[in-house]
Regions:
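Conserved glycine-rich cofactor-binding loop
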Residues: 17, 24-26, 49
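Flexible N-terminal pre-Rossmann segment of NAD(P)-dependent oxidoreductases
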Residues: 1-19
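Aromatic pocket-lining residues of Rossmann-like dinucleotide-binding sites
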Residues: 35
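Conserved glycine-rich Rossmann-like NAD(P)H-binding loop of the short-chain dehydrogenase/reductase
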Residues: 40-56
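Conserved catalytic-site loops of classical short-chain dehydrogenases/reductases
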Residues: 95-96
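Conserved NAD(P)H cofactor-binding loop of Rossmann-fold oxidoreductase domains
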Residues: 100-105
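The beta1-alpha1 cofactor-binding region of Rossmann-like NAD(H)/NADP(H)-dependent oxidoreductases
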Residues: 72-83
Length: 106
């Protein structure tokens, strides 16, 4: 990414708490990292791939945002509620929720 562009945008999400679903890989992971570059105070990432989730969490923390990884299956309503509950307890009110997760019935 162009660092000059990122530095101009650094405070766009300053002090905001963001949840990004489907963020253990691909566009979800990149979206979560972009929020960190844009100054988000804290980001909750979630998905079913725990190893990848922990790796993305470390990358986000290196950028400068706090991060929580929650292993979750978004086809399970209790998991969805748990994501928001854990985020609220850890960081406070959720300001933005971005759904990148998809579901395909097999």
């Amino acid at each position: 990414m162009n660092k000059e562009y990122l530095s101009d945008q650094k405070t766009q999400f300053n002090n905001k708490v963001v949840v990004v679903t489907g963020s253990t890989q691909g566009s979800g992971a990149e979206t979560a990292k972009l929020f960190a570059h844009r100054g988000a105070k804290a980001i909750t990432i979630c998905g079913r791939q725990e190893g990848q989730g922990e790796a993305i969490k470390e990358q986000i923390e290196t950028i400068g945002s706090k991060c929580l990884y929650v292993k979750a299956d978004l086809s399970n309503v209790d998991d969805c509620r748990n994501i928001i509950s854990l985020t609220d307890k850890e960081f406070g009110t959720v300001n933005s929720l971005i759904n990148v997760a998809g579901y395909t019935e097999r």
